[in-house]
Amino acid sequence: PPASPPVISMSRLFLSQVAACLAVFGLCCSDAAVLAYQETADPSRFELTELVRGLVQPMELAVGPDGTVWLIEISGKLRRLSPGSSVPELAGELKVTTEQENGLIGMALDPQFAKNGWIYLQYSPPDYPGQHISRFTIVDGQLDLSSEKLLLKFEEQRKECCHHAGSLHFGPRGELFIATGDNTHPHGDSQGYAPIDERPEKAPWDAQKSAANTSSYSGKILRIRPTPEGGYEIPEGNLFPADGSAGRPEIYAMGCRNPWRMTVDQKT
């Protein structure tokens, strides 16, 4: 039988919220339980190393096989930090809109990056009302803009803010996971609670149109398998059939608010 799809976990922010809840719970329990929690959260177990300063809204980073750190800024800049250096070099820049939390918001290196130089970027073009997920090639340490292969694009509303999420990660079998936000205003009449507003003029405040919609790419974790030609396949294990008869076949998980960051368990 085919292998089960990997288990995906939410961002560090989510994990920190869980840890905070456990801490509060520990206050209501025995002293031993509190001490046990304190031991598992001992910050002295971690070593902090400062790599660089002066970045403007860095979004994601990835470490290449040779130790080079690749990172993106929301303004559209891709930077490269060589091993032993504290000065990141500009490796390329995409034209993006940065309104309403848009911009260059996701990045992942291809599992065979050392051989093919492929890098995947999730960004918000200024001339398209939505998001692009594209593959580019790094040539001599620089982003070759002419090498772009557009894998996936989807429209969003830009009348109101917010929630575009944006995070890319590869799984152990070459699957690319893509985090997308619900593209819904979190405030206003909903007062920070789940935005469900079916009044026609309140569409930007209604997440039913996105996170709960099987025909929308927004408010989801998508899962595809990129092909060398620049397209992608649908791996087994997604929510809906590959023929699109019941929903977008790229959807792996739905009902997400704003999955800002994620990790993929490479063992499972």
Which residue ranges define each predicted feature?
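Surface loops at the rim/top face of extracytoplasmic beta-rich domains
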Residues: 71-76, 100, 113-268
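A short helix->beta-strand "capping" segment at the edge of beta-propeller domains
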Residues: 37-55, 148
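Beta-strand-rich domains and repeat architectures in extracellular enzymes and scaffolds
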Residues: 50-76
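Beta-propeller domains
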Residues: 70-92
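Short coil-to-beta transitions that initiate beta-strands within beta-rich domains
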Residues: 54-58, 99-104, 217-220
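Blade-loop segments of beta-propeller domains
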Residues: 87-109
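Bacterial N-terminal signal peptides
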Residues: 17-30
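Short, Lys/Arg-enriched N-terminal segments with co-localized hydrophobic residues
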Residues: 1-9
